[in-house]
Amino acid sequence: MPEQPDGIWIIASDARTLFANAAMAEILGVPASELIGKPSFDYVFPEDAPAAQKLFDSKQRGDTNPFRFKLRRQDGSPIWVDVQGTPMRNAAGDFIGIVGTFSISARQE
């Protein structure tokens, strides 16, 4: 199986999508243009929302540790991804969002 390119997802401090590349759109099963402005939590299963919020909050505090997470594709199916997220800050040091790379996990949970 050929290696898939990583998805890149840039998420604002209010969790809205600022940018998603074609690979990220493919992971989520939605056109990239439809992701812009959409809440990133729309792609999280409701039962996983508290864990997703904790991860988002940890990135806001500066955590850069990678993690594995289950996303909800547009068709409702689950997909496990390995995520490397880095907080973005403005010149004043204020948190403005997260840039993340997402790769399809070789191992399903």
Predicted regions mapped to residue ranges:
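PAS/PAS-like sensory domains across diverse signaling proteins
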Residues: 14-16, 26
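PAS/Per-ARNT-Sim sensory domains
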Residues: 45-57
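PAS/LOV and related PAS-like sensory modules
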Residues: 1-13
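PAS/PAS-like sensory domains
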Residues: 6, 58-68, 82
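PAS-family sensory domains
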Residues: 70-76, 89-90
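PAS/PAS-like sensory domain cap-loop motif
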Residues: 24-35
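Short loop/turn elements at sensory-signaling interfaces that couple input to output
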Residues: 83-98, 104-107
